Curated annotation (Swiss-Prot):
Its main location: cytoplasm. Its cofactor is FAD. Transmembrane segments: none annotated. Keywords: Cytoplasm, FAD, Flavoprotein, NAD, tRNA processing. GO terms for cellular component: cytosol. NAD-binding protein involved in the addition of a carboxymethylaminomethyl (cmnm) group at the wobble position (U34) of certain tRNAs, forming tRNA-cmnm(5)s(2)U34. This is tRNA uridine 5-carboxymethylaminomethyl modification enzyme MnmG. It comes from the Bacteria. PANTHER family: GLUCOSE INHIBITED DIVISION PROTEIN A, PROTEIN MTO1 HOMOLOG, MITOCHONDRIAL. Pfam families: GIDA, GIDA_C_1st, SAM_GIDA_C. Belongs to the MnmG family. NCBIfam families: mnmG_gidA. It is found in: Cytoplasm.
Length: 629
């Protein structure tokens, strides 16, 4: 049976990738349908109740800069905010928030239900309809057929999901939700490369059974940060602390004595788990020299008694989980309300995707989130936004868009996935970005909001606020450039009190601000440079731009060199078999990856500079050597 409406874009899945993937084309004016197996779990935080962190906070800011939802929802739901690496340089500072699960889900659902051009329908998708290698729609469990010109699949851990607790296992997409078995079989039939990954979650503990009085308390920042560039401190709900405990030798002994009941250590689980979020049994065995591990007790919400013990993800049997929990300080009498578990699921090789997240073999079909081998809400949201944008552009047969590595962490994420693939759950770190001084949290809007405006992703209010900020930055920099202090100035004595070394020649406000001991606040406390600007975001940009000017200019020079290769496109129909001077190994890798540019080809493992030169020569010979704008 055909549904009465025909859509431009259908998004399958209502998690963090799916919600962003649905909102983006709807904001661009495309008629969009979000298909979910349960409308009550839209925006569900399936694992840890937190948003952001190192690298991840950068992604949240980027999603927000392009009109996405995650930052707004995190501001509405955040019950503890912290700026990580606050004592380090601006490139690695990152925002993190503990979130109230209920408030977060409410913020997501409210945004979805009030978005024009977006419909929501509760049904399990069981088949993706394809004609002549082109997607035409989706069919559901009840036999309903939805027609669309493009489809974004954001299935999370649901594709052939299998939950493990001890040596027992059963089908499931997450605790309490069924797996998508039929859809998994259908995707395997399409000939896409598929493998299995694994992730896990810890048991949840009843807060009423924890002795918080003997535990260390961790408060959030006193000056509360915000995720959204349009946010306000007034958006934040009540702030509450987290607590800290530790595993000990007794904990580790419980784990070691029960490894024969672990699905990981008995070979029942074959999927590879996240390297940077290992299970507690993995930590105990891999770091056998350590006699304790720090565990954060994170509240799940203002109205919930559930506590998330961050650091003891496990798939051991329930009785062993009880032994682990009760062995720790403050948790001697703690009660588990939800057991921890591991989940195995299908993911598809992201090297079979274009950088737009469209599959190379099926036109109009896009993948986003854990289906591409990533882990984390933030990585999923960034991919969902990108896939949703390009699903809309595909409908209009417009040029696709994707960010470069020098433009955003989303660009780094997508390039890593599509060029190198992954054999383990991939997460973003600042260390993955070679241009991280330019890819800071604080300038995500400067990097991406103009692009979002061109794509139709942001409203007039955001665009006006952005332009006002840019105007404030330029005006303040101009003001500081034009105010000079010289050794004969009547204000010299005042200035020398705060300068590390006395002023011996004239200097502008910008010159003074470049000094290591000088800050914007100190500078604008001096009489010649009063008053300070009220726009704190603009102040931050002024200070960073001036203090790091040399480093920033150096990175920009490197980027310009790299762009020459990035803009040298390799046509999709380029025949590597006709390039006789390439080795068989190199030719096979290029045929497998089908890079879209010389730059992407150069990042494939085993592709040498000599091979790149050969490709360039052959592109020129065949009249295919074209450079992008």
């Amino acid at each position: 049976m055909f549904y009465t409406e025909t859509y431009d874009v259908i998004v399958i899945g209502g998690g963090h990738a799916g919600t962003e993937a649905a909102l983006a084309p709807a904001r661009m004016g495309f008629k969009t349908l979000l298909l979910t197996h349960n409308v009550d779990t839209l925006g569900q935080m399936s694992c840890n109740p937190a948003i952001g962190g190192i690298g991840k906070g950068h992604l949240v800011k980027e999603v927000d800069a392009m009109g996405g939802l995650m930052a707004h929802a995190a501001d509405k739901a955040g019950i503890q905010f912290r700026t990580l690496n606050s004592s380090k340089g601006p490139a690695v500072r990152a925002t993190r928030a503990q979130a109230d699960r209920v408030l977060y889900r409410q913020a997501v659902r409210t945004a979805l239900e009030n978005q024009p051009n977006l419909d929501i329908f509760q049904q399990e998708a069981t088949d993706i309809l394809i004609e002549q290698d082109r997607v035409t729609g989706v069919s559901t469990k009840m036999g309903l057929i939805f027609r669309a010109k493009s489809v974004v699949l954001t299935a999370g851990t649901f594709l052939a999901g299998k939950i493990h607790i001890g040596l027992e296992n059963y089908e499931g997409g997450r605790a309490g939700d069924p797996a998508s078995v039929n859809l998994s079989h259908r995707l395997r039939d399409l000939g896409l490369r598929v493998d299995r990954l694994k992730t896990g979650t810890p048991p949840r503990i009843d807060a009423r059974t924890i002795n918080f009085d003997i535990l260390a308390k961790q408060h959030g920042d006193e000056v509360l940060p915000m995720f959204s560039f349009m946010g306000s401190v007034d958006d934040h709900p009540q702030q509450i602390p987290c607590y800290i405990t530790y595993t000990n030798e007794q904990t580790h002994e419980v784990i070691r004595n029960n490894l024969d009941r672990s699905p990981m250590y008995t070979g029942v689980i074959e999927g590879i788990g996240p390297r940077y979020c290992p299970s507690i049994e993995d930590k105990v065995m891999r770091f056998s020299d350590r006699n304790s591990h720090q565990i954060y007790l994170e509240p799940e919400g203002l109205t919930s008694n559930e506590v998330y013990p961050n650091g003891i993800s496990t798939s051991l049997p329930f009785d062993v989980q009880m032994g682990i929990v009760n062995s720790m300080k403050g948790l001697e009498n703690a009660r588990i309300v939800k057991p921890g578990y591991a989940i195995e699921y299908d993911y598809f090789d992201p090297r079979d995707l274009k950088p737009t997240l469209e599959t190379k073999s099926i036109s109009g079909l896009f993948f986003a989130g854990q289906i591409n081998g990533t882990t984390g809400y933030e990585e999923a949201a960034a991919q969902g936004l990108l896939a949703g944008i390009n699903a809309g552009l595909y409908v209009q047969e417009k040029d696709a868009w994707y960010p470069r590595r020098d433009q955003s962490y989303t660009g780094v994420l997508v390039d890593d996935l599509c060029t190198l693939g992954t054999k383990e759950p991939y997460r973003v770190f600042t260390s993955r970005a070679e241009y991280r001084l330019l890819l800071r949290e604080d300038n995500a809007d400067i990097r991406l909001t103009p692009i979002a405006h061109e794509l139709g992703l942001i409203d007039d209010a955001r665009w006006a606020r952005f332009n006002q900020k840019m105007e404030n930055i330029e005006q303040e920099r101009q003001r500081l450039r034009n105010i000079w202090l010289h050794p004969r100035s009547e204000y010299l004595e005042e200035a020398n009190k705060v300068l590390g070394s006395p002023l011996v020649r004239e200097a502008s406000g910008e010159d003074l601000l470049r000094r290591p001991e000088m800050t914007y606040d100190i500078l604008t406390s001096l009489t010649p440079y009063k008053p300070a600007m009220e726009d704190k975001e603009a102040v931050e940009q002024v200070e960073i731009a001036i203090k790091y000017q040399g480093y920033i200019e150096h990175q920009q020079e490197e980027i310009e060199k790299q762009k020459r290769h990035e803009n040298t496109a390799i046509p999709a129909n380029f025949d590597y078999s006709k390039v006789s001077s390439l080795s068989n190994e190199v030719r096979a890798k290029l045929e497998q990856h089908r890079p879209v540019s010389i730059s992407q080809a150069s990042r494939i493992s085993g592709i040498t500079p000599a091979a790149i030169s050969i490709i360039l020569v052959n592109l020129k010979k065949q009249g295919m050597l074209k450079r992008g704008e």
